[in-house]
Amino acid sequence: MEYASEKRIESKALPGVWFTIARMSFGRRIELTRRIWELAGKAEYLEAGADVRGRLEAALVAAEIDSVYLRWGLRKIEGLTVDGEQATAELVVTQGPEALCRDVVAAIKAECGLNAAEAKN
């Protein structure tokens, strides 16, 4: 049996762009959980607040969590350059199309086995 530790996916947001993500493993799940543990607790606390500032902070923390997922799971991007440079995970996060970031994060969360409600957080 051959097991591929990565998965190649065509972007729904940008047809013709392909990205490769890490598949979930026991060790990767531990690593990812460690990376998002503190942020996830903070997001949950802030979401419980009723004021606008708390909700804005919760949205910021949720975006930071998505950034962790993206940097953790995105291995390669094909078919995209950003300002003349071959796209990388860091370049896509900082300067790339937001729709692609959302597409990649959704694929990574699906690979992690998160349902829609869990993926939202």
Annotate each language-model stretch with its function:
Residues 1-12:
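Short acidic, Pro/Gly- and aromatic-enriched capping/linker segments at domain boundaries
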Residues 17-20, 24-121:
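Short, surface-exposed, charged amphipathic helix/loop patches that serve as local interaction elements
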